[in-house]
Amino acid sequence: MKKKYLLIFLSLIMALGLGACSNNKDSKEITIKTVTDLITRLDNYQKVKEEEKRLAEEEKKQKTSKKSIQEIEKEEIEAKAKKELEERAKKKPVIKKAKLKAFGDIMAHIAQIQYAHNKGGGEYDFSDQFTYIKDFVKNADISIGNFETTSNPNLPYAGFPRFNVPESYLKNLKDIGFDIVTTANNHSMDTELEGVMTTMDAVKKAGLDYVGSFKNKSERILLKEVNGIKIAFLAYTYGCNGRENLIVPREEVDNLCYLLNEEEIKKDISMAKAQGADFVVVYPHWGIEYQSMPNEAQTSLGRKMIDWGADLVIGNHPHVVEPVELYQASDGREGLIAYALGNFISYQNYENNKDIRVEQSLALEIDLEKDLKSGKKKIADVTFHPIWVGSYYNEYGIDVKNHLTEDFLEGGKYFDLVNESQRARIKKANDMTLKIANTGVQ
């Protein structure tokens, strides 16, 4: 376009030149020759400029190409490093954890009930029992114990031999950090079939879960999820002091889980696994009272439960501590069997029973782990915590309390709250409990 205008401009110059030199032939020839030369020169100049522009663009392109190669190399290095990090991240396990605390028999003798009534001013307040241990119970994802009594408001509250407590006892358990209570034990029918049902109602009203008794078959298995880990709970009893047979034949009591039918237990464990349980915890009420070693029936059934798929078997009933063993299942898993944990709280003691073991108990702190990537699960750690159950006297009566022994021995946070005589009992409870818990099982 520019060239077109240039030619027009030059044509005008030529026209003017021709007019001015119309009488001079030589001048006309020179003018034409000069203009032609000018056009040629301008064309050459344009070509030179275009070539310079082309060369500049080529040089720029080459520089850009070199820069791109460097950038590409940098990007490749960065991409490789990113991929390596991603590969490492894929291999690195994503561990989820859950802390379970397991406790023994939660009893309520008449002295405990009377104290709670006096403390509550006409109501029932059991909170003093747990003054020293509540922080420990709360510090867990799930805390579970055996509720060895009933709660039936239609019958008098009582201790041994037919236990019955007000609903407030369960509320106090909830307040100190309990999440689950087992309701299958030899005292489950102390207030008859009605008591089995009212106890379940009271447990739910307190905000707790129960396992071992049920209103429908789906409640045989209690499934809880903590931090992405699913834990199934099962509970069974050897019987109910024969009371079921006084009311109806035991096989017709359709609201309790019994130990007699091994196929049912095996089926329950398989069902729990089918429901997605990562770990299965079984609470059997078994063994012989006041025996520090499990009998053959306990060891046989406990190990079978692990072989069937259970991971933890937490026994109760003897009211004294029995050994804890790690047992390798037939599929290579390692399961834990605690044959008996003793009395978490009760008014059984040396003075009343002439047996110091009944005032000693064991709490288990169990750390469970699951790798979300590989799906691998394991019992990561188990810690033994001995407990001593002692009594005090005040204006309300006999104040029964449980004591985590580590808190009352040298360096413990409650060291100064007991006298030397009490500390000696606490030390004995600590040592005896750890010794029996670590005793091997044949």
Language-model segments: residues:
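Sec-dependent N-terminal signal peptides
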Residues: 6-13
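Acidic, metal/ion-coordinating pockets
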Residues: 23, 30-58, 63-442
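C-terminal motif of bacterial Sec signal peptides marking the signal peptidase cleavage site
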Residues: 17-20
